[in-house]
């Protein structure tokens, strides 16, 4: 768009429908372009081009279309897509979903302005994630190990404590044995005012805000802002990682609210719906978020992602978790049954998986016994869960001594390993030592997945 076209002010609004306005007679307008809107009262609002064809543009107004009309509303296309002013001064600050300060502090003095859609990352320039990130949560560090540059979602359900878990990960996550800087970028989308207050108070109470950047989009904020929030958060993360050399963990909650905003906007544009009314391009859209995690050759920083989503009706085959699973590198599944037992965090380790766990465990990263001892307790827990179904039919008295040991192991595993305090920050050594204590329930001859050398080195019965 030329400088002359940037200064053109259009008064040719032909229709207003919900958050959308249609402008006719336009020239040189591009998809995603930012729009300056002047209301009849003189108030300034901002919008974004959702569709541009020939001489017609469809614009979504961030602040809504209340008080706009077709005769007195003025439109000016600014000639560029949404950009974010970034700076290291953003650390320790809380912003709304559009990147404006929420904490009463001053506006950020930008060191750079970056397109929030990011830049295409050449696959050849990517490096494989291989460094352990400690979250202090046994069911993640032990059985579903997170590595720097990975993207692993948490699949939750309505009413489950994923917000507690998100806040705990945000304040406890760290890179072990390293002087490298670590930061958390937290993006909340479509949350209630109560949830917003919880997150803000939690970050301030624990001091986690010092090394964090927080973006909060509320449920009653515009849907288009919900689409921008994760992109703004990821742009901040990429700046801190690739320009400032920091290791950044991005936590995004709730991706389901993000997808609902996609569906709302698609319906307003009269698009042909896909599965369950979601737009057919939802897979591609989610990929533009998740694929911004990783490590880049020649850059010391990394971007690691933990997106959190609530599965409607606890349905893991729902389009949102289904498509997310195709793009990401595993999943951490929260269990309603464990939550009913009062176990926190209610992580079900059996369907959970970290596809890159093998890259971040072992001697020099966690501990030499990590993969073997976790494999052993995982197999024992799976057998114990299977025996619970058998007990429901034949009764516990019908079980052999061996079966009773595995049944006990499953119970102790949930109470000692899975369950931990909301402020309990376990080191990986503490996590693995708990596993060895649990394995004392079984006779040593049952520990077939662990070498004799490791048994002699770590088994409590062999320690002096």
Swiss-Prot record:
Q: Which CDD domains match?
A: ATP-synt_V_A-type_beta_C, ATP-synt_V_A-type_beta_N, V_A-ATPase_B
Superkingdom in the source lineage: Archaea
> Record keywords: Ligase included?
no
As for subcellular location, the record says: Cell membrane
Signal peptide interval: none
Q: Name one Pfam family in it.
A: ATP-synt_ab
| GO CC, alphabetical | plasma membrane
Q: Quick one: where is this thing mainly located? A: membrane
For this UniProt record, the keywords arranged alphabetically read as follows:
ATP synthesis, Cell membrane, Hydrogen ion transport, Ion transport, Membrane, Transport
Please tell me whether the keyword Membrane is annotated for this protein.
yes
Q: Which SUPFAM superfamilies match?
A: C-terminal domain of alpha and beta subunits of F1 ATP synthase, P-loop containing nucleoside triphosphate hydrolases
Q: How does it sit in the membrane?
A: Peripheral membrane protein
Q: Return one Gene Ontology term, BP aspect.
A: proton motive force-driven plasma membrane ATP synthesis
Q: Which GO terms describe its molecular function?
A: ATP binding; proton-transporting ATP synthase activity, rotational mechanism
Family note: Belongs to the ATPase alpha/beta chains family.
Q: What does this protein do?
A: Component of the A-type ATP synthase that produces ATP from ADP in the presence of a proton gradient across the membrane. The B chain is a regulatory subunit.
Self-association and partners: Has multiple subunits with at least A(3), B(3), C, D, E, F, H, I and proteolipid K(x).
What protein name does the entry list? Answer: A-type ATP synthase subunit B
Which species is this UniProt entry from? Methanococcus aeolicus (strain ATCC BAA-1280 / DSM 17508 / OCM 812 / Nankai-3)
Classification from the root reads: Archaea, Methanobacteriati, Methanobacteriota, Methanomada group, Methanococci
């Amino acid at each position: 768009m030329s400088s002359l076209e940037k200064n053109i002010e259009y008064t040719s609004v032909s229709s207003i429908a919900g958050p959308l306005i249609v402008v006719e007679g336009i020239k040189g307008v591009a998809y995603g372009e930012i729009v300056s809107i002047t209301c009849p009262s003189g108030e300034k609002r901002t919008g974004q081009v959702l569709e541009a064809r020939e001489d017609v543009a469809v614009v979504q107004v961030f602040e809504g279309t209340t008080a706009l009309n077709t005769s007195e509303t003025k439109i000016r296309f600014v000639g560029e897509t949404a950009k974010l002013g970034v700076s290291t001064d953003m650390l320790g600050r809380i912003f709304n979903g559009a990147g404006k300060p929420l904490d009463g502090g001053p506006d950020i003095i930008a060191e750079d302005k970056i397109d929030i859609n990011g830049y295409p990352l050449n696959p050849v320039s990517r490096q494989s994630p291989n460094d352990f990130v400690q979250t202090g949560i046994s069911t993640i560090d032990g059985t579903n190990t997170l590595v720097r540059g990975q993207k692993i979602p948490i699949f939750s359900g309505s009413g489950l404590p994923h917000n507690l878990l998100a806040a705990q990960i945000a304040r406890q996550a760290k890179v072990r044995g390293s002087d490298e800087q670590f930061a958390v970028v937290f993006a909340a989308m479509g949350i209630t005012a109560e949830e917003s207050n919880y997150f803000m108070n939690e970050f301030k109470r624990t001091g986690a805000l010092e090394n964090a950047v927080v973006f909060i989009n509320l449920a009653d904020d515009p849907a288009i802002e919900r689409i921008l929030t994760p992109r703004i958060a990821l742009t901040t993360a990429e700046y801190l990682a690739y320009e400032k050399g920091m290791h950044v963990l991005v936590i995004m909650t709730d991706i389901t609210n993000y997808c609902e905003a996609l569906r709302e906007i698609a319906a307003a544009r009269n698009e042909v719906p896909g599965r369950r009314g979601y737009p057919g391009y939802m897979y591609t859209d989610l990929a533009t978020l998740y694929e911004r995690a990783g490590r880049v050759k020649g850059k010391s920083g990394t971007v690691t992602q933990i997106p959190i989503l609530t599965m409607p009706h606890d349905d893991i085959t729902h389009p949102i978790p289904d498509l997310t699973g195709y793009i990401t590198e595993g999943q951490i599944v929260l269990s309603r049954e464990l939550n009913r037992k009062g176990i926190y965090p209610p992580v079900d380790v059996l369907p959970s998986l970290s596809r890159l766990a093998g890259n971040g465990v072992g001697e020099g990263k966690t501990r030499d016994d990590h993969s073997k001892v976790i494999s052993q307790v995982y197999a024992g827990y799976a057998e114990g869960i299977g025996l619970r179904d058998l007990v429901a039919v034949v009764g516990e008295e019908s079980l052999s001594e061996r079966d009773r040991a595995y049944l006990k192991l499953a119970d102790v595993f949930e109470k000692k390993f899975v369950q931990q305090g909301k402020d309990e920050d376990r080191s990986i050594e503490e996590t693995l030592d708990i596993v060895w204590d649990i394995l004392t329930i079984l006779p040593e001859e049952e520990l077939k997945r662990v070498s004799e050398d490791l048994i002699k080195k770590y088994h409590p019965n062999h320690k002096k």
